[in-house]
Design a protein with these regions (language model features):
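P-loop NTP-binding core
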Residues: 1-269
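A short, hydrophobic C-terminal helix/tail in secreted or cell-surface proteins
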Residues: 270-274
Length: 274
């Protein structure tokens, strides 16, 4: 099985990474894909949003899995992986992952520990999605080193859009030095309130600035209280508000992402020179 590994990345918090990871993952599962979600954030936001309110009480999390790889200790197949009722699997995270990030600093092959772990799972899944932490630290570098694709959620505001350059430089550096297979699938505009001229202007600015170098998804995700309610209930937006705008948006995004998996679609997705 040719596993697609997609990192959902942006060093800015609050841009919809976790919501995108959960709902894109479940959207892919609804389309018949076998999906594993990886919570790559010590805050455990993805873990919590999928119905595990106390990540610290879980017996096995991503920090344990990476620790086994780091210490060259054996892993049982599927150890610690949880199953969500909406058809996706989850490798959860808790605050111990922040300690793992510190441990990685002086480790051999420190950028590839997550990749080595995912190599043990690849044949079991068609898609692995990684919810990256909101920083450009060693955990995010590990995610980019493990992935072959990146989706960048960006809130339709000036400052988050401005911060894109730093992330693109990091992606470019990882591609150049560690992972030549890494490609940017596209920029996803989130929390776009098309009732305001400001949001429309930011969306247009992003498309003008990056559209010739990087795909900007046609799909735009609207702001929604329902999405927050869904996370609080441990459900996807499809289960919580199936006929709402956000559910429609993530269904459309899922279709766009699957279309990119045809070989011809990578020809124009080149990284900008930095």
């Amino acid at each position: 099985m040719n596993t697609q590994i997609i990192a959902i990345a942006n060093q800015k918090g609050g841009v919809g990474k976790t919501t995108t990871c959960a709902n894109l993952g479940i959207g892919l599962a609804q389309a018949g894909k076998k999906v594993l979600l990886i919570d790559g954030d010590p805050q455990g936001s993805l873990t919590i949003s999928l119905g595990n309110p106390r990540p610290d009480k879980l017996p096995f999390t991503l920090s344990d899995a990476m620790g086994r790889i780091l210490m060259d200790e054996p892993l049982r197949p599927g150890e610690g992986i949880l199953h969500h009722p909406e058809g996706v699997d989850l490798m959860p995270a808790d605050i111990q992952l922040s300690g793992m990030e510190v441990s990685l600093v002086n480790a051999m092959s420190r950028e590839t520990i997550l990749r080595q772990y995912l190599d043990t799972l690849k044949g079991q899944y068609s898609h692995i999605l990684i919810d990256c932490q909101p920083s450009l630290g060693m955990l995010t570098v590990n995610a980019l080193a493990a992935a072959n694709r990146v989706i960048i959620p960006v809130q339709a505001e000036y400052l988050p859009a401005k911060g894109l350059e730093q992330l693109l430089q990091t992606v470019n550096k990882v591609k150049r030095q560690i992972n030549p297979k890494l490609q940017i699938d596209g920029i996803l505009l989130t929390m776009v309130d098309n009732r305001t001229n400001f949001a429309k202007e930011i969306a247009a600015l992003l498309r003008d600035t990056y559209g010739s170098k990087i795909k900007v998804f046609k799909t735009e995700i609207s702001p929604s209280v329902k999405a927050k309610e869904a996370s609080a209930d441990g459900k996807s937006i499809y289960a919580h508000d199936p006929k709402g705008k956000v559910a429609e948006g993530y269904k459309n995004l899922t279709q766009e992402v699957m279309k990119l998996e045809k070989p011809v679609s990578y020809t124009h997705l080149t990284l900008p020179t930095t």
